[in-house]
Amino acid sequence: MPAAATLSPRMRAALAVASTILLIKASELLTLSSIPAAAGLGLLLAGCVLQWASLDGAVSSLVLASVVAIGGPLAELPFIELGCWHYLAPTYFPLQPWTGDALGLSPLTGPCYFAVTTDAIALGRWLASGVEPPDGYS
């Protein structure tokens, strides 16, 4: 059971948003720091797991956030190819055998997707907590 289980869905959503903001800011600071990418990735992943464990704790949420953490950054590759944006210090090149160093990602992007997914789940639960089911449904 998560540490915040006794809190209302609204408070859990607020804590999820606040912790996501902190994790994304930490990602920025780690990107600009001299800390090795692997260490920064470990720190962010630990923060994400702490966020999930303390605010949610559901295995289904962990699976969903993990899938999004992997698939989200990969879904950015077409936009990087089109020149919509690029990363300042890409060190992860998932398509390197075919594209060389043209399509690079920051390894810190995945944990940000994880945190935002945990955030979205908490917001969804809060919004759903005030919704009454239609007649005939329970």
Residue ranges, per PLM feature:
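Aromatic-rich, lipid-facing transmembrane alpha helices and their immediate juxtamembrane interface loops
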Residues: M1-S138
